[in-house]
Amino acid sequence: MADTVRKPQKVVIVGAGPVGSLAALYAAARGDEVEVYELRGDLRDPSTIPLNFTKSINLALSERGINAMKHSNREELTKNVLRDTIPMYGRMIHGKDRGQLWEAAQAYDVHGRAINAVDRSTLNNALLDELEHTPNVKLFFNHKLTGADFRANKAWFERRVPGEAPLPNSANRVPEIEVDFDFMLGADGAHSAVRYHMMKFARVDYQQEYIDTLWCEFRIAPTENGEFRISPNHLHIWPGREFMFIALPSADKSFTCTLFAPAVHYTYLASSPQKLLDFFDVHFPGVSPELIPPADLQEQFATNPHLPLISLKCKPHHFGSSVAIVGDAAHAVLPFYGQGLNAGLEDIRVLFEVLDKHSVYDLDASHEARREAREKAFQAYTDQRCADTHAINDLSKENYVEMRWGVKTPLYKLRKSIEEILDRYVPSLGWQTQYSRVSFSNQRYSDVIKLARRQGTVLGLGLGSTFITAVGVAGYMMWKNPKQYSPLCFMRYCLRHVSHIWVKFFRNTAYA
């Protein structure tokens, strides 16, 4: 019968960033007719990139993002992207002690695994090039989503070309194009237009937070010989209690740096160029003049914008069978775990896995059956992903405290050492650091939190029991032999051994 003829689904994706582009590849691989609409111009155009990307925190690509790319079945694409990344095997903590600059490495992983620094435009260009050579994908740049009806499955876009004044119609409005779709994916960032229009149809719980921290980008130029000025295989951190300065390597042998600090500090630093130099000299020793000339530091601070950090959660991530949101549109996270990109790419893998699981791509199913299957799949996506994206949102906030100051505390180092020893020498226990679970596995973020808390409880009980036992034994010995084991001798013995442990593990160890 005529009504049983199967047609490909039409998928409209709003946003041509890395997450939207990967979603288009997944949908195209399943035979969908895909249209990608992007507000900005072609992101591969060099004249477009500075406007959108140069004032952007560098991206970190780790296991979750890589795994999502591999599941697109574009092996060469994944290889090409990874070839242009720079592996970072750990943090390099910088400081100054008694007038001497020092640095100490802290490996991310006891097994030597790395996260990858990637240039956003390089990643985006590779994905867009792949889409351009995919026959069932169409790209539309300079198109702004102005409206959507998610019951009628229609959307409206304005086409705005830079340099061209839009010609209004008789109603004095810029002409719009109407687009039909089977379902839409919103990958259009934290200020998502898709989410805005979806909230007119779905009862969405929405939480947005601007933390009291601004960020500003700086650049460490290559040496005169075109080499890196500091180790390229580390994320460099100059920590402070309320602020920090970080540096990530770039392919051109420079470092993209970011100053994170409360707004009050930015106001203070902006009041005088000399205050900026004094602040860096005290809190970020070794940055200027060693890595960034003072004049360049002042110019970059004055020229580059001082931008806020946004964190948002929402639930659900879909409405009916017609729309779902992914990436920052669904869960903008703070950049302090390096998981914003990875969580967004993982959204795509999870979404299409549940679409497959619910037989949305069963070619023998009717249009109505596929619609019903899609609605169930979108609900499953929301049920799974909301718990996980809320979890990584919370973890990212917590990691800001760790990066600013926790990396220097003995308690952090002690727990890290114990967990890494157990991971390396007793792997059957399944013990890992929280960071390893987040960055080097595909475990659900919500499960990572549960496991980390369980490990923390066990460690706390273990250390507490050890301490109580030691005190009990010491008390018994002092009671039996008060002259030989006086309290003063016992305190000296403990301090001597604590000092030995400190020197052995915390001052002379780089967690290699």
UniProtKB/Swiss-Prot annotation:
Its main location: mitochondrion. It comes from Aspergillus clavatus (strain ATCC 1007 / CBS 513.65 / DSM 816 / NCTC 3887 / NRRL 1 / QM 1276 / 107). Catalyzes the hydroxylation of L-kynurenine (L-Kyn) to form 3-hydroxy-L-kynurenine (L-3OHKyn). Required for synthesis of quinolinic acid. Its cofactor is FAD. The gene is bna4. It catalyses: L-kynurenine + NADPH + O2 + H(+) = 3-hydroxy-L-kynurenine + NADP(+) + H2O. Belongs to the aromatic-ring hydroxylase family. KMO subfamily. Disulfide bonds: none annotated. It is an enzyme of class 1 (oxidoreductase). This is Kynurenine 3-monooxygenase. Its EC number is 1.14.13.9. The keyword Oxidoreductase applies. Keywords: FAD, Flavoprotein, Membrane, Mitochondrion, Mitochondrion outer membrane, Monooxygenase, NADP, Oxidoreductase, Pyridine nucleotide biosynthesis.
